[in-house]
């Protein structure tokens, strides 16, 4: 699914309307004492959207903020990223593969990757999550959310924060 996963300079991040995935945001976080890294990756459009036929390679990147949580462990935080939003059925497997691919780019003491996704909720399209006035009732229980997001993954390691 993913190829060309490699580090790059944060000032080389692609332009995006998502502020938290920009070189500027990296500078803001660095001025506050955070360590940041940028990572390039590519994916076939068919692996993201299920469209058969034309093979198109999509290039993307993401900004990762590293946080030391104590003297022994750190966490990786991806604010409002990745920007690519696969079709619902490919989201879990995409993030799983991205996470595994990022392992070699992260410190050895990094114990987790937290994604604050800017993707549309799975449940935003389901009518039973809206009341008679069309107002969204909210997401289902955490266990249902985790089950749905882990669907199609190999390791079932995603947890709802």
Per-region residue spans from a language model:
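N-acyltransferase acceptor-side catalytic subdomain
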Residues: 1-161
């Amino acid at each position: 699914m993913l190829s060309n996963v490699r580090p790059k300079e944060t000032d080389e991040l692609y332009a995006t309307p998502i502020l938290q995935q920009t070189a500027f945001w990296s500078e803001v976080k660095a001025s506050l004492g955070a360590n940041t890294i940028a990572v390039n990756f590519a994916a076939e459009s068919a692996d993201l959207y299920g469209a058969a036929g034309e093979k198109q390679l999509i290039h993307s990147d993401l900004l990762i903020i590293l946080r030391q949580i104590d003297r022994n462990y750190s966490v990786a935080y991806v604010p409002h990223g990745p920007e690519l939003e696969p079709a619902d059925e490919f989201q879990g497997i995409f993030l799983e593969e991205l996470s595994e691919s990022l392992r070699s780019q992260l410190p050895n003491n990094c114990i987790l990757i937290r994604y604050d996704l800017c993707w549309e909720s799975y449940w935003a399209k389901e009518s039973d999550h809206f009341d008679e006035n069309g107002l969204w009732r909210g997401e289902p229980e955490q266990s249902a959310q985790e089950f749905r997001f882990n669907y199609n993954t190999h390791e079932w390691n995603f947890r709802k924060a």
